Amino acid sequence: MRTSTIFSLLFLAASTVVPGCTCVARDAETYKADTRNVLETRNKTIKDCYDVALTTDPKLDGTVVVKFKVEKKTGKIIDTAVDTARTKAPESLSKCIVEAVDGLTLDPVDQRDGMATFSWTFKAAEPKPAE
C-alpha cells in the first residue's frame, strides 16, 4: 500500500481589512485549517500524481513543498510554486501537485490575503516478504 502524508501547513495572514467586504475575518488557526481542508479535497489527485511517479521509480520517497497565496478578493489559490530548496522529489511529481492545487478556492473568502507553505511527504511501501 502506498502512502502519502500531509506533513505540514504554515500559514501567515496579512492584516489588511477590506471595507464593505462580505467576507469573513478568520483568525490564523482557522485560516490555516480552512486552507488545509480545501487542499485536502485534492488528496486523491495528489496520490494519483505519486502513483504515476512510482511507475518510473518504485522506491520513490520524497517531499514536495509548495508555496502559494490565497487572494483576499476571490479566495483563490494563486502564485502556486514549488519551493525547490526544500523539495526532494522529481520535478514531474512537483509539477503535478502544483497543477492539482492551483486555482482552488477558499469559501467564504477572507478579508486578508494569505501566504502559505504546504508540504507533502511520500514514502514507497515496503515490499512484502516472500512466503
Regions found by a protein language model. Name each.
Residues 1-19:
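Sec-dependent bacterial lipoprotein signal peptides
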Residues 20-131:
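Charge-biased low-complexity segments
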